[in-house]
Amino acid sequence: MQTHSSSLVFLALLCLSWALLVSPTRPPSQPPSHPPIQPSSQPPTQPPSQPPTQPPTQPPSHPPTQPPTPPPSQSPSQPSPLPPNIACKSTPYPKLCRTILSAVKSSPSDPYHYGKFTMKQCLKQARRLSKVINRFAQRVEADPGTSTVEEVSAVADCGELAELSVEYLETVTEELKAAELMTAALVDRVTSLLGGVVTNQQTCLDGLVDAKSGFATAIGTPLGNLTRLYSVSLGLVSHALNRNLKRYKGSKGKIFGGGNKPVREPLETLIKVLRKTCDKGKDCRKANRNLGELGETSGGSILVREAVTVGPYETDNFPTITEAVAAAPNHTFPEQGYFVIYARAGLYEEYVVISNKKRNIMLIGDGINKTIISGNHSFIDGWTTYNSSTFAVVGDRFVAVDVTFRNTAGPEKHQAVAVRNNADGSTFYRCSFEGYQDTLYVHSLRQFYRECDIYGTIDFIFGNAAAIFQNCNIYARKPMANQKNAVTAHGRTDPNQKTGISIINCTIGAAPDLAADPKSTMTFLGRPWKPYSRTVYIQSYISDVVQPVGWLEWNGTTGLDTISYGEYDNFGPGADTSKRVQWSGYSLLNLVQAMNFTVYNFTLGDTWLPQTDIPFYGGLLHTE
């Protein structure tokens, strides 16, 4: 690292408080970021005749959907105080947890109070970290010749992620003020946001390490300790809120409520109105009037605030999607309706970012391979994996329908993302994602994909979201010579994160280039990017493109006893599990375990998907 940053690094270490400087209980997890998969020198280990009996770690089940009951004004018997050593058992770092909670003057009876205390510490430290990173970024921008392009990009990512984490923690702090009356949906959102903070921190650190930044060396220990503070808070808050739900019998409720204004439309009706009214350069300003004239419609429907069009005609509102996004209002609520962007058929060579303040945006195209958003940023060309995306979305409740997203960098450019998604309650319907390595970055929070096509090679569905894929086609492409394909690479770093990749009723097959040369490479269902990686395949067709062992290790035996990989009721020539890996973190799921990874139970999608009017099923296709 050059001398210009040494003083700022020293400032960073001074600026961060005692909570960051507690000695770590173990070094931060820093596995490499998506290297090309090279052939193994040893053949895969053959499993025994019976699959392992240890099931994957399951997300907690949700309580019955009963009306919330207010807490009693006074409990019949006063619960005994809860000492820190007991409360800290719910966290992955009990020693650090006890050190932090030693500042609490008296032991409360409810672990929620411990969680609330640590949340204050988290928010305080997150704000300080954001300031430190922003100051460093300003120094780098002022004197760019002293830093590499990769370092500049990685530091910029850290600044963006740090600001996001502050916003998430502020939201959580506000929600926790009424923790006793929280519904399951709000609990799920709170724990998802806290899990997202942990993911943001890890993404920052990974990016700095990949960029070989001296800043990473200097700030690595404080970053690691702050990540542990976040993990401690996540464990305490998750345990406390789930305990309160059971205690007060809270209902599922709704995380994103609806309203009766401005206009409610079925999704397919909305699409037809847009395409008919705006066909061949007609004045699309009539679209909003037509929607208003249709008014309330029976059956499923969505709320529409305003509709704008993107295209080459003079009657279109905007020539680019980026300009249309910029025109959307900021910080809108669900009851205000969607800001609908209709992008005509065409090739849009632009890099679109939907920021955290742009919420309730619905992007509608003319269909797969008709409305195409394309870019070619890649890791080899100096972009971080996080920022190589052609299309990035952070704003809550984003919906995309009938759009193709591409990254055309090619396999020789390594990591090159088509879509990066860290938007809570986001949905992609009838879309396609085309790339090679790292095509679809399901970064964080809760996501749903329905009837989509995903193409790629190495780790082409990766990240640390709670992402569900229903009725999708997943195609492995032909990589470079001596590389192996992995469909998924989930990145859970904390056992309390309610994240994972759930693939239900999908087809896993070969793209045309690989189908023409099937013996050119080996394809696997996934590999563990991080220690608590979690992925399941349920009631899906698995073709013979998948190797009989099914799964691939990341780095030797690392994480194979802490991951959660499972399969349930799949079919097809590649679904035979008799030769699957014999890792302790892999198993064949039973019905009850598989149900934990459905829309109803894994993401509580039934509390936020109905407002999109996109079809979904909450459980399994069949249970026989």
UniProtKB/Swiss-Prot annotation:
Annotated substrate binding sites: 385, 415, 527, 529
InterPro entries per UniProt: Invertase/methylesterase_inhib, Pectin_lyas_fold, Pectin_lyase_fold/virulence, Pectinesterase_Asp_AS, Pectinesterase_cat, Pectinesterase_inhib_dom
Pro residues biased stretches: 25-84
Cellular-component GO terms for this entry: extracellular region
A Pfam family the protein falls into: PMEI
Record PROSITE patterns: PECTINESTERASE_2
Active site residues according to the UniProt entry: 438, 459
Region (Pectinesterase inhibitor 47): 74-236
GO biological process, one term: cell wall modification
List of glycosylated residues: 225, 330, 369, 376, 387, 505, 555, 596, 601
Protein name: Probable pectinesterase/pectinesterase inhibitor 47
Taxonomic source organism: Arabidopsis thaliana (Mouse-ear cress)
Gene this protein is translated from: PME47
